[in-house]
Structures are given as structure tokens and as C-alpha cells.
Amino acid sequence: MPQPPFTAAIFDMDGLLIDSERATLRAWTGAALALGVVLRESDYLQVVGKAAQDSHAILQAHLGGVAPFEQAMVAVRAALEEGEGKELLFPLKPGAAALLAHLQAAGIPCAVASSSRTDEIAQRLARVGVLPHFAAVAGGNEVLRGKPDPALYLLAAQRLGVAPAQCLAFEDSHNGACAALAAGMGLVVVPDLLQPAPEVEQACLAVLGSLEDALPQVPLWFGAP
């Protein structure tokens, strides 16, 4: 794995920058229950960090086919839209704003590499006030193969104009971590719903409890004050 100092940072979004996975999990389990299907948390965790197409195939299998999946998808979108209308459904994770502001002040370019669509990325990050910190965005709708394939991370690095080996990726999921490693980047894991697998933990630079723990490491990782 590449070693510091790095010259750019690339972030996953869901479960890392914003606390979205829990609300989405609740929406899916509720929609499944309305169809008479018990979708366990362990079932939902199979889709975390995966590309939309792969996630949909897994959920279809759990829900009993395309038709019930599509019915559940409508209910999930309605529940999330209703929730976002009432409150900030996907708040920033602790430490995210401070870390991004510090990197920007230090002249370290940042990008997002997320399985979500680019319009969702822009909307959610703008809502929590951190979109201006990012010089580039790469969304799941822009690549043929999603995480754990490295395409998203490679696209983000290309848009920053930085070699992959000069990028430090921040991830929360197994599939995202594997994508960053396959892209040849340094990796920091901040687990959300799942702890990293042993092989990921061995390959990454650090496993942190929160992005708050990343801020003191900026001088070491980026050679920046």
C-alpha cells in the first residue's frame, strides 16, 4: 500500500461523511415488513457499499422477486423523502466538517467517490454544507462497475488530476475499502455498521473510531500543517 505523505483525499459519502445507512436500513426493513417479509439487519448489510445494480439484485432475492422489490423501492423512496422534509435525515458524521475544512485550508484537494448518483451526492452534501470543500465528484451512475471495482476511485483521482498512489481514501464499508485498495490508494477505514474484515484491517493505514480521530493525523498523512 502507498505510504504518506499523500497529496489528495478521496471520501466515500454514505456511512462515512453522512449518517445515512441507519435511516435507509429502517426504511427498507419497514417496506419489507409491509410486504410480509422480514428483512434482517444482516440481510441489508450485504448491500452496504455495493453498486446500485448489485444491491438491487440482492434485495430482489430477499424480497422474492422484481415486483415486490419495485414496490418496496417506491415505499423506501417515499419514506426517505418524507423524512427529509421533516428533518435533516442524513446529518454529517462527527468530525467530517472540521476535517474537510482543515484539508481545504492546507491546500489538499478532496473528492467524493460514492455509489450514490451524482445528483444525490450533490444534494446531500449541499444540504449539510460541505459540498464546496470538494474539487471533484464521482458517482455510481458514471461507471460500469461499482465498488468493490476500483473504477469509482480511479475516476475521482483522474478528475483531481492526481495519481492514485498519491491519494488517501477514507471508507466505512468492506466493498469500498476493497475498491480503494484495488485502485492502488492509501486507505483509512472509519467503520459504520460493520467492522472491517481482517484482510482490510491489515492492508489499511489506520482504523479509526470517528473522523474526529483523523484530524490530528493530517500532518503525518499529508505533510500539511
What are the residue ranges of the model-derived segments?
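Metal-dependent phosphoesterase signature
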Residues: 58-98, 106
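Asp-based, Mg2+/Mn2+-dependent phosphohydrolase catalytic module
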Residues: 2-7, 101-104, 117-225
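Active-site neighborhood of HAD-like aspartate-dependent phosphohydrolases
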Residues: 2-46
